[in-house]
């Protein structure tokens, strides 16, 4: 039995072509006249390489004319030669959906990686789907409470919205995504789908182990197309994961969280594919279809009536340049941005969120309420004033400031440290259990802090803790009491003592101590 005959039995189609050209992951296939497959159709080729037989999946990307189609391979093309039979499946790439995908790892083609053969009999959906119609969308705006102080207070997330974690390499984007998976599963019992797009294989394995240890793997489906995969796979893996999430939203009426790490790699893979297809590059070498490809993905991530897909996307910023077309194009689709800063990271404050650079469309009294909005704006005002004073402190020293500004600086430093929090994803490294702080307690704590009720407490007492109970416990362990001070204004003498004129690092001397706390 020939390979073409076997494929006919598997796919139910007799539309068979042959390979005429192979250039890396780009494969040109010739079909009989009048039988050219449609764009995005999946094609199968049976090949043998070094005594290993495998089925290669190709996706039709271009019609070249004269019954020729140009395809992108989803796997390495080692062993593929001219003349090999290629069968049109008559449909696009599809992936398994349903409750059975939870607790398992899949690739972009829907093959189970942790249990080969698993899921073959599942219902399958095409990865190329239309977004919900306008009249199906949920008009209501609702906040998603995470239990992370800095997020809930200053950059509240939208249920059913799109949230981005911006940052350069090594500032904690993946750790924060792992933290959110833990929190959603433990605190809300929600379904999560994770898309590993072009990131390190080691990180995928670590995530698998951590989710299993935290007993949340049973509520999570993982789809990986890591950085060693061909660009076609890296470009499609986000769509495969999104399709699984859409099933839970549309068929099971569930709220779903979709995590994408890293959306920049999706753009990068699209750029590689565009170059391979011979398209003229656009700005900074990116593909001319960048905005279109991003829109096709992002428009499917939305809330329909009564259920939602909330997406959290890590965005690598090349060379920390936010004007780069990849992160700039992503901005247009977002409801909230959480920027992870290298300067905050260097102070040992985790999560390393820059509260002044991060934003949310729902930080508005009509959504979060007057009290939340007032406290958030006061915290931002104090931190912004502290930032404005940095140059003066660096040149003249803190002693040259007015008394009111000295007090504000000390208060801002306490706010900075109180925005840090011990995280569940870091328990094995810190030895401290992760903390979840209710929104009401977060607002109350920062309201008191911004009014000066805690000015008498040492800065280190605010570092990497949860709520007010943790603050009281840590302050008492350092010999201070919560009710010893008030808002009378005088900053603790130890904070400004010996900070002389011209000391360029006067306001950051506590940072090293924080790291050791």
Curated annotation (Swiss-Prot):
Lineage top rank: taxon: Bacteria
Chain positions covered by the region annotation Disordered: 475-517
SUPFAM superfamilies reported for this sequence: C-terminal domain of alpha and beta subunits of F1 ATP synthase, N-terminal domain of alpha and beta subunits of F1 ATP synthase, P-loop containing nucleoside triphosphate hydrolases
The keyword Zinc-finger is annotated on this UniProt entry: no
Molecular functions (GO terms): ATP binding; ATP hydrolysis activity; proton-transporting ATP synthase activity, rotational mechanism
Signal peptide range in chain numbering: none
Cell compartments where the protein resides: Cell membrane
Residues holding ATP: 167-174
PROSITE patterns in alphabetical order: ATPASE_ALPHA_BETA
Enzyme Commission number(s) of this protein: 7.1.2.2
Biased composition (Basic and acidic residues): 475-484, 495-508
Membrane-topology annotation of the record: Peripheral membrane protein
Catalytic activity: ATP + H2O + 4 H(+)(in) = ADP + phosphate + 5 H(+)(out)
Top EC group: translocase
Any one Gene Ontology cellular component term annotated for this protein: proton-transporting ATP synthase complex
The UniProt record lists the keyword Translocase: yes
Quaternary structure annotation from Swiss-Prot or TrEMBL: F-type ATPases have 2 components, CF(1) - the catalytic core - and CF(0) - the membrane proton channel. CF(1) has five subunits: alpha(3), beta(3), gamma(1), delta(1), epsilon(1). CF(0) has three main subunits: a(1), b(2) and c(9-12). The alpha and beta chains form an alternating ring which encloses part of the gamma chain. CF(1) is attached to CF(0) by a central stalk formed by the gamma and epsilon chains, while a peripheral stalk is formed by the delta and b chains.
This protein's name: ATP synthase subunit beta
